[in-house]
Amino acid sequence: GARRVGVLLRDPAMADQLALVNAVLPQKRRLGVIATPESEPLVRELQRAAQNANPAWDLQVEIAPDARSLATALRALVPRSDALMVLPDLIGDSQAATLSVLHAGAGAGLPVFGASEGLVRSGGLAAAVSTPGQLAQQARQLGQKVASAGSTGNSNSPLVEAATPATVRINATVARGLGLRPPEERELTERLAAPR
């Protein structure tokens, strides 16, 4: 018979990322996102989350296909944003590109969010990240789901899961510099794990 496939994504869902921004900046509503053309599915997922948020977030998106266009995209984005987000795409994976976004945010007094602990250590405000232990546990559970779903009919569509629950990391120094008093990491992590 056909074997069902389970796919575990390395990063938390965009809805979790947005929930974190919402929890840290409850009064703000404009989120600036720099994306690469390849990250369009992530942008679409974030747009859905932004529309479903209550109240909705106003997503400002600039596409930067390469390092040269990054500076131009940031210049256009910063004045229209209350916060910036680095997606787990080619920009988020590139240290130089991430630092460009962090510098632009710092220069304008905007908090920067992302999906990696490295971003927070380098001057980002907060990130919803997946930890290796939590990914391993989720992979085991996904394996059990795949095994038990083997007997049912729709075995040809893969089971795809975003990393969950996300763990929140905050840079307290950056928060103080921005005059923000976000909740504790543990409280934010619990808040993201709660059903919305």
Each predicted region: which residue ranges?
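Short hydrophobic alpha-helices and adjacent helix-cap/hinge residues
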Residues: 1-196
